[in-house]
Amino acid sequence: MKFPTIKSKKDSLYITLFFLFSIACIAGLRYEQRLEMQKGIAEKIIRFHVIANSDTKEDQDLKLAVRDAVGIKMSGLLKDAADRSRSEAVIRKNMEDMKQTAEKVISERGYDYDVDICLTDTDFPVKTYGAYTFPAGNYEALEIVIGAGRGHNWWCVMYPNMCFSNTMYEVIDEDARSSLKRVLSEDEYQQVLASGDYQVKFKSFEILKGLYDEK
């Protein structure tokens, strides 16, 4: 591509400012688009969040044991839930049972920690599950807080099921992929089917470079 030659420093300044302004506008629009995309994704999924009492090995192991016990039960309860609304209703209906399940695991391991469990809106960082990267933002989640809740946490996507697979580990099987593709729009699905690298290459940089190269 042939670019016009910059004839003076004044021209150079004007052109630079123009392109910087254009880049800022494009970046702002893309940011707004990502926010809207995240909100759209959040409206269609439910996440699962377990917070340990502390970061000691014992408390972290306990967190995973609670995760497994609750996860196995919820996996069975949610397997026939047709949509997000139905999944939310099943979770709310079984909240007390899930709390008792967590308390039983804690007691059997010799601890007397309190357990708080709720379905709540929670801020999540960017999180990758296999090939899927979910943008940071606010999501509804089944949240379990063990004891003081000061330890590292664990999270996954509860609906559609992306974390319960027999042994409860994050194994994204074909059913999970199909379910996710079914509940998200094509644009939303392509958004999460990313590496997590959100860097944007603007054509403006190429144009600006070309202008200076031909000075």
Predicted regions and their residues:
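Glycine-rich, aromatic-bearing surface loops/beta-hairpins
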Residues: 1, 188-215
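N-terminal Lys/Arg-rich, disordered targeting/topogenic segments
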Residues: 1-8
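Hydrophobic membrane-insertion alpha-helices, especially the h-region
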Residues: 13-28
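Aromatic-capped interface at the extracytoplasmic side
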Residues: 27-41
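Early exported N-terminus immediately downstream of N-terminal targeting peptides
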Residues: 44-95
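Soluble periplasmic/extracytoplasmic beta-strand elements of cell-envelope proteins
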Residues: 45-51, 114-118, 141-145, 155-157, ...
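Amphipathic, coiled-coil-like alpha-helical scaffolding segments used for oligomerization/assembly
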Residues: 84-125
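Soluble extracytoplasmic domains of inner/organellar membrane proteins
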Residues: 132-198
